[in-house]
């Protein structure tokens, strides 16, 4: 695999939506309604990295109590892993080739709103199941990009793959809300957005807690309908992780990254830089971003079987790392609120280690916080 940027599998050029697994989506905006007036405003809590956190205020002692509660009574699991997992439990270089956690994600339901999921994949070990399909005939597969990678399967693999996933025992739920490019046909931007809205509403109504949602996708505009649905999902107590987008612009300009309470993840590289290929192609940035996570040279499951390393960068690959870490935390601390999860994730991140991060964007790198 040479470029994750080829994996434009969801409502891209024709439909004005990007599954953020690379590839610059088209500029067809559709209207989608006006965005909420409030945008995604920061709170008064200092982030400690030169920017202001959007999370709920919390003292360092309170955050440490959350981490301690998560670690209590758990035995550690150490695995040999590629760099994108290795870095999650290390504050500094060099990496040691291992990931050690005190939790596995067991008992946590992860809802992956995406192009589909190969639920029979060996990496998922029988832990993946069909939740709902709002875009086409039900099947157990996934869409394929130009390079043969199933976007949703790869994302799910980062979250909960047995060998290459952050939370190797989490339960994965397929929620197909993104139209495959090959199935574009008579679809329209409005129809594509409607499928996403239905997906979000379904998760809000049917989620089994503890639960977390992954949305490795972005519209190329703001949609009041989608943002309203996502806000209700967050308000229902479900942590919701969103990719910052591959447009290399302000993540706040896109839905659902502009929704208050969502956890927005930008992409970093193996050399500890903010991912930016060139020009208008790179990670989203700005005050709506919560933190960075590995988004280049990521290894995970391929639809149809096997695994591969995606050499190119994508925020779609970054977001599921954060989702997996949340699954780890929730498996050890299942009664944590969405707000507590959000605060904990932001405050346990490693600060100031990335290069090429804009001054208007938090310089925070995802960390497991010892869970």
Functional labels for PLM-detected ranges:
Residues 1-10:
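N-terminal export and membrane-targeting signals
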Residues 16-19:
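C-terminal motif of bacterial Sec signal peptides marking the signal peptidase cleavage site
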Residues 22-23, 30-77, 82-86, 174, ...:
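C-terminal subdomain of the subtilisin-like protease fold in secreted/lumenal serine endopeptidases
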Residues 72-112, 135-147, 232, 273, ...:
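N-terminal domain-start motif of subtilase-like serine proteases
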Residues 178-261, 281, 285, 303-320, ...:
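Substrate-binding/access-modulating region of protease and related hydrolase catalytic domains
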Residues 238, 254-331, 335, 342-343, ...:
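Extracellular S/T/G-rich loop segment that most often corresponds to the catalytic His/Ser-adjacent loop
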Residues 92, 116-117, 121, 125-128, ...:
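Sec/Tat-exported extracytoplasmic proteins
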Residues 97-130, 141-193, 208-211, 222-223, ...:
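Subtilisin-like serine protease catalytic core
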